[in-house]
Amino acid sequence: MRRWVTTLAAALLPAALGAQQYRVADSIVESGIRRGIYPGAVLVLGGRAGIRYQKGYGHLTWSAASPVPDPDSTRYDLASLTKVVGTMPAVARLVEEGKVALDAPVERYLPRFVGGAKGRVTVRMLLDHTSGLPAYLEFFRLTQDRDSAIALLYRTPLRRAPGATVEYSDLNFLLLGLLVEAVSGEPLARHVPRAVLGPAGMTHTGYGVPAAARERTAPTGQYRGRPVCCSVNDQNAARFGGAAGHAGLFGTGTDLARYLRLWLGEGELDGVRLFSPATARLFLSPAEAGATRLLGWERPPHRANGAGEPCRRPCDSAYGSELSDAAFGHTGWTGTLLWADPARDLFVVFLTNRSYAPRLGNSIRALRGVRGALADALVRSATP
């Protein structure tokens, strides 16, 4: 049945994308399995109107007896995709409702976030990673429980002046998760499903994994030779209770496809509006021409619009070298990726469990090469 659906989808593609281009995509994804970067993957491609192609590759583990990943039912630990799939849209809805102001100081909503120059850190700075906070802190080693982790987060000093430079930081989104809880009055694990995932029709995405879905969930590591799955891989997220602003969501390829279609539709999908076109455009607008970050989203830095350094070929970027100025996306440490290019009406969801016992050294860099090659192949085939 899956093969029939895939073939039908390919037959319905616009002329700019055809079966040959999807065979190239298959070959690129399968090369990552052959090289030992990941045991399996799912790929979902499409545009505003819907999914055009979807497929699962390899297996959930290196054993051929383990299930083949399925775009509809295999749940992946989304890692940092949680930032843009859960936390950021929750903030966007609160902004639209007038409950949060992007340029208000964070301390207005989180009064314990004080000290030094923290009074100048705004909500916007958390979203675009210009707060001045350090990139990372081992809360799981330095604290004993969620309360002590939150206390450490609040007292962590800034490393740079607020607004001065971009430094991608999990701490920014840990704070945003706490902000969503403070303003909404609900735990993140309740608010995000109610305010974001449910309205978006993402029925197979959430914090943690239901018992009925465990056998079809991709493991993200090993312990004493056995697969480890179904609880968040990120140890800081675990310290924060499993549902944190920077990590914690599990989801499927087709659910994430719905989410990207919603953004291509400027906040609307299947007659349901999550937020207004103005809010969608606000969160997808760069602060300046050379910006590499949007509000939550990453802005691929290699494009001819001057954002970042020129990309060397082969391009050492998860997004390749061909995306337009309008493109946006994000990656996750476990091996997850999504991006969309509104100028080409194209989205890509590419989920792997790279973190599960990779057979290749420096699998993060190797996966980046696969992602970049895939992006370039798809964009070139979609360009008249």
What residue spans do the PLM features occupy?
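Bacterial N-terminal signal peptides that target proteins for export
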Residues: 1-8
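Hydrophobic h-region of N-terminal signal peptides that target proteins for export
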Residues: 10-19
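Short, conserved catalytic-motif segment at the N-terminal edge
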Residues: 22-76, 99-101, 151, 234, ...
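Short, P/G- and charge-enriched loop/turn segments at secondary-structure junctions
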Residues: 30-32, 75, 162, 322-328, ...
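Short, surface-exposed loop or secondary-structure junction motifs
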Residues: 57-59, 116-326
